[in-house]
């Protein structure tokens, strides 16, 4: 696709609304072609570097399977398998990898790292997650929403994000709403709201596209009429333990449970989560949370909601691969 050819994919606001629509259409086509055994390989002979300073199941598998489906080869560089930022500057790493690879995925820390890779590598660079943004996740979310509300435009959909909205997911949701005109409600304590400047910028764009962005602490009004309720983990492995109690106390009331789902007044409301989710006591961290804070049966979402018919999280997870494939095909093939 000439519009995207050789361009980086760093954050959603680097693109127009029509470009975002084109990517979603390509993802839907690639998904259908794969399922119908009609996929055409566009990336034969391409070499792709996958830099992971932060581990991930979905992102790594999505990039690898998408690349293999399209005939490309991948090299995985984990946190212990590269010198990036330690013995070699990001700028130098970018220039080395750019001579060997046709595209580079980065999942890690600051947004400035992925931007430096894009500036100096000379090849398309894709943001698999940074501290500030998670654009590939939002592509998967938008495709999933389209699939579950066929025939509805985004500016006719209401998406609620409940929990900690000051993270990369909150930022990328704001950008998605700006481009698509979603009715986006960030339902969170004020301490967990995103930066005001980004909210203002995205709100103005969303309004022009027929949507609205609302920030509220009030759960009942915030979720009323929602088509989708979304949440993410409250604590991550590796965060200082002293932050856990503070975060849980702040967010406990914003757990997605059957009561919150009922408050929407929409019997067809769906549940989204970027995963992994602490919805039971079957993980190391989930067990710790249950034992230390009494969060049995789920932290940010209850097991009841996660395992219910309303949950479309595994459709969403599958769509990571199809949308990531669309990004690679769009940026690496003419």
Swiss-Prot record:
Sites where the protein binds L-ornithine: 168, 232, 236-237
Enzyme class: transferase
GO MF annotation: an example: amino acid binding
One GO process term, biological-process aspect: L-arginine biosynthetic process
EC number in record: 2.1.3.3
Subcellular location: Cytoplasm
Amino-acid biosynthesis as UniProt keyword: yes
One Pfam family linked to the record: OTCace_N
Positions of carbamoyl phosphate binding: 56-59, 83, 107, 134-137, 274-275, 320
A Gene Ontology cellular-component term: cytoplasm
Membrane-traversing stretches: none
Record's catalysed reaction(s): carbamoyl phosphate + L-ornithine = L-citrulline + phosphate + H(+)
The protein's annotated pathway: Amino-acid biosynthesis; L-arginine biosynthesis; L-arginine from L-ornithine and carbamoyl phosphate: step 1/3
Major subcellular site: cytoplasm
Key words, A-Z: Amino-acid biosynthesis, Arginine biosynthesis, Cytoplasm, Transferase
Cleavable signal peptide: none
Gene3D superfamilies with a match to the protein in the record: Aspartate/ornithine carbamoyltransferase
Family: Belongs to the aspartate/ornithine carbamoyltransferase superfamily. OTCase family.
Biological role: Reversibly catalyzes the transfer of the carbamoyl group from carbamoyl phosphate (CP) to the N(epsilon) atom of ornithine (ORN) to produce L-citrulline.
Subunit structure: Homotrimer.
Name recorded for this polypeptide: Ornithine carbamoyltransferase
Organism: Salmonella typhimurium (strain LT2 / SGSC1412 / ATCC 700720)
Lineage: Bacteria, Pseudomonadati, Pseudomonadota, Gammaproteobacteria, Enterobacterales
Gene: argI
